[in-house]
Amino acid sequence: MTAAWTPRVQARTFDEVTAAIRRSRAAARELRVADCAERDGALLAVADALESRAIESAPRASAAELRDWAGTPDPLGQTLREEQRRDGARMRQLRVPIGVIAVLFDDPPHHVLRLLGPLLKAGNAVLLRAARHHHSAAETLVDIVREGLATTRIPSDAVQLISSEQRSSLRYLITARGDVDLLIPLVGPGLRATIIPEATVPLIEVAPGKGHLYLDATADPQLAEDIVLLCQTQPTGSGLTIDTVLVHPDIAAELLPRLDGALRRAHIHVRGDKAASAVMPDWGQVEDGDWATIHQQGQLLVAVTPGLDAAVTHIERNGSGHTELIITEDRRHAREFCNRVDAATVLVNTRPIADTPQHRSLVYSTQRLAPRGPLGPTELTTTKWITNPDRDISHG
């Protein structure tokens, strides 16, 4: 038996928003007991609906990613710890869904479709709130998603859209503790500055990545060139966010002209500090405030830094805690860089290629508490303890 489907369910008024949250709560209860085959079937059905109805290529690409998530291991029911009490009872800590997750977003809706894979795979109901200028496109895409869900055993209310621009509705959404279990605000700095201090619902802080690539004295020039170009030409939203290169002075005179040629061919605008500009006079000059700024793709900053200590200090001052890289043949320097740099991801002598569904995730948490890094289904779960005296009666 398939779930009932109501097209174009729009939550625009305050009362409609509260009703949508109640429906999400009910859907979350059904998702809690849905098995992996049912959740995977829902992902595949949504992918089919997107491919058959979507006109643009971006939603079809999102459909392919949904199929990828359907082929990943089930995050639910995994035993994390097992203990035995003195009375002989056995205790197991299992992964379970979080419940209702609200995603607030400013990006085009097809970007947020990429989140549906891990969210539904982890058994969560999803409330989407789009920016005003994306309402029409979001309504169309969510309608397609719900149509796909209606052919499965997963309720179509597992995915709903909130279109209300009323401040009272937004405030209710971010303070509906107990009804909404988690917020993921994919919004600009202005709205983020409002949401984070006012929200009583737990949230995952998502910051745009500002990563650094440190080229140590023993860096492989070809690998350095490849990684710089990759990070500057990768598709938008892929999470590869290196826009500052730090170069050891021993290799600056040889490496910077080589990088300049490759970057010019790729039409990438480069600015350098005084030391870098002394080697490459045609480069623009970096202002002091530029180092901590998130720059658009196709813009690169270069600094000549006197060694590992200076590079780590620069990263601590200007990084966002997203992704940091080092290229070096010195194992001690590699180990020290990994230990000292505070970031969700640290890479050594490797291209940051997002070749798994999780590392292609749109959402990358840079907060101190877990989850940190790319958000896959496992990171979008919580846990429960189940205790029984002599045999396992859980369905996990």
Q: What is each residue range found by the language model?
A:
Residues 2-8, 14-26, 72, 329-396:
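C-terminal segments
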Residues 2-64, 304:
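N-terminal alpha-helical segment of soluble enzymes
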Residues 5, 11-15, 106-107, 121-122, ...:
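ALDH superfamily catalytic-core signature
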Residues 249-341, 345-358, 362, 374-375:
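NAD(P)-dependent aldehyde/semialdehyde dehydrogenase
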Residues 36-41, 153-159, 234-242, 267-275, ...:
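Flexible, glycine/charged-enriched surface loops at secondary-structure junctions
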Residues 79-222, 253:
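Rossmann-like NAD(P) dinucleotide-binding subdomain of oxidoreductase/dehydrogenase enzymes
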Residues 59-120, 337, 347-350, 361-362, ...:
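Active-site cofactor/substrate anionic-group-binding motifs, chiefly glycine-
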